Amino acid sequence: YMIDLLTPNGLKVKVPETETEDNTPRFNFSNDMENAINYYEKNGYVIFSSLISREICNQLRSLWGKKIKPYKGTIYRQTTAKVENNLFNERDWIMNPILNIQSLNPKLFNSFREFVEKEVFSNINICNVLKSILSEKPKIVQSMYFEGNSATWEHQDSYYLDSENIGEMTAAWLA
């Protein structure tokens, strides 16, 4: 059953609760890139399944739980562009996302930062998909880590960050 929600601006949306409820096509990076690129060009987004292994995702969440969640100091945040302590909700999720994982203090967060750099930022599947879409080698401009939903209002990412030529930058969301 689809979940009926209102966006922060009051728009009604139906959100699938499971993947079987979602009719959005998913593409395989190893044998369906042409269709994926066509879908991206037509719709402005594309979903790929399994670019990163479940094991890598589990290791990343484990490092997050061991290194970031218990940290009592301040970290630079995406929402406010300020250094802040972790803000937890009733589910013990950090609600103020981290901005620029690649800039985390290596003395405090080296294992988390290095893992993200190696297994996500340098992931060959992600890099190949982005190179296919962009027709050039991808470059990281900004990274974020969200654990809890901060109720961002509906937007296009170019409202916040884009290239000199509007629309020539893309974002990758990993879930």
Each language-model region and where it sits:
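Short, conserved beta-strand element in jelly-roll/cupin
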Residues: D162-A175
